[in-house]
Amino acid sequence: MRISDRGYGEEGRERLTLVPENVDDLWHLAHVLEPGDLVEGDTTRRIQRNDDQMRDTGGQREHLFVTLQVDEVEFARFANRLRVSGVIVGCSREDQLNAHHTINVEEHDEITVEKHFKPDQTERLEEATEAAENPDVAIATVEEGAAYVHTVQQYGTEEYASFTKPTGKGDYSRPREELFAELGEALAHLDADAVILAGPGFTKQDALDYITEEYRDLADRITTVDTSAAGDRGVHEVLKRGAVDEVQKETRISKEATLIDDLTAEIAQGAKATYGPEDVAEAAEFGAIETLLVVDDRLRTERQGEGDWSIDVNEVIESVEQQGGDVVVFSSEFAPGEQLSNLGGIAAILRYRLQ
């Protein structure tokens, strides 16, 4: 994320001109923008001339500069765009005021956001800005007969490629080198800045030997990690062990994987942890929260007034921060966020055990 300008609007609202530089940045914006915010940007709108009246039911598209009062925000993950919908409150054509419209924000599009930013939203934007300096990382996991490649995003990991077929002896088996060749070709095509090669046993080392010999450009980018499995389970082990941090300093998802493991361990011991909105709010009142964990999509729903929590989540967050606790907003796109959702969407690691 690049912040190209800062200022202030009416009623003390902060104005930030932002340029999302990748799909991660669009995802961050989806969790920063809320109903009532103002978003300015270039767009196109279908205009039809009909007795000198303008409407958007047909005709040619015209370029406009609009300010929307936001009603709804949607991160279209597979289209690599952010859809910001709302009412036009400012426009280069006055006849379009008060009409409903949607701005499609894509990578490298510039928009200006005017709103009262909450502390966790400011932190999210700062995180996105700092992450622009991190290298792209791929995790390749391999075991006998199977190999997988995952890309590491800030909102989670995504499977980029998978190759499964028995290797070794048998009528339907194939030479291991064929599997390693497919893996090497996928990694070369992905062209990540760093590759973590993981898996159980000696298969991982054999794959490394093959790839460094046949794909020499990849050799200096690969580090290896021992895991008990390949695929999603192996990826989780890589993240939990902090292997991604070694090449990317710190990533959101490796931090989340460690925190959710710490939380579930404390819960299993009946120790310093609590979960669910009411219990977490009570812990915040006692000043007992060391780290507050909340899922991004649930946080957004509650802030929009569409949730069913009986607590004010903003008050809980402010209370935790005022008492020196940390607040971590989990991605719902990744396994730790799913685990946290199953615990009610909000939980806390405590400074001390509550009776």
From Swiss-Prot:
The keyword Ligase does not apply. GO terms for cellular component: cytoplasm. Keywords: Cytoplasm, Endonuclease, Hydrolase, Metal-binding, Nuclease. GO terms for molecular function: endonuclease activity; metal ion binding. Its main location: cytoplasm. It comes from the Archaea. Monomer. The N-terminal domain has the RNA-binding Sm fold. It harbors the endoribonuclease activity. May function in recognizing stalled ribosomes, interact with stem-loop structures in stalled mRNA molecules, and effect endonucleolytic cleavage of the mRNA. May play a role in the release non-functional ribosomes and degradation of damaged mRNAs. Has endoribonuclease activity. HAMAP family: PelO (MF_01853). Belongs to the eukaryotic release factor 1 family. Pelota subfamily. This is Protein pelota homolog. It comes from Halorubrum lacusprofundi (strain ATCC 49239 / DSM 5036 / JCM 8891 / ACAM 34).
